[in-house]
Amino acid sequence: IFNKRKNLFALNIAKKSKQGRMILTEGYMDAISLHQYGFDCAVASLGTSLTEEHAAILAKYVPEVVLTYDGDEAGQNATRRAIPMLEKVGLRVKVLRMQGAKDPDEFLKKYGADRFSLLLDKSENQAEYQLESLKRKYDLTDDEQRVEFLQKAAQLISTFPSAVQREIYGARAAEAAGITAEAMKV
């Protein structure tokens, strides 16, 4: 019996790629478009959210996954849900942000493969993605919102597994809010 929870669209092609990573898309049309533009490492879950089974399958083939889900709220929620699932199976997770297009298919049609490749190379690690997503919710010129951002950022950063990550991203949050890194440690 065919089980969507255990299959990834285009895995048969992507697993042969020499890229050393897979690009995970929200829909199969995005994966098809990426393949047409030369990105042979793209896969998509088949009409279902990413599952633990999908994550385990990806981990068999590559050390890194780049999430390229849609930029809408549903896509960003799916990105946030996927990150811990992928990390749990030992994958490095990066997130690609697209400006000016809702998904990879639209981006490629508007801007082309070269520009997508540049974005791919600049994709954020999960810590950068989560901190930047949090920052975008606040007006950091307003003191009350700066305080709220810093409180939420501190909660987020405290979940990062290494002291080095906490130091780096604590300093970035402090810089974004215009305070010293020392004040962030208090």
Question: Which residue ranges define each predicted feature?
Answer:
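Phosphate-handling DNA/RNA-contact segment within nucleic-acid enzymes
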Residues: I1-Y61, V65, A78-T79
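A charged alpha-helical hairpin associated with nucleic-acid processing machineries
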Residues: K15-M22, T51-V65, Y69-V186
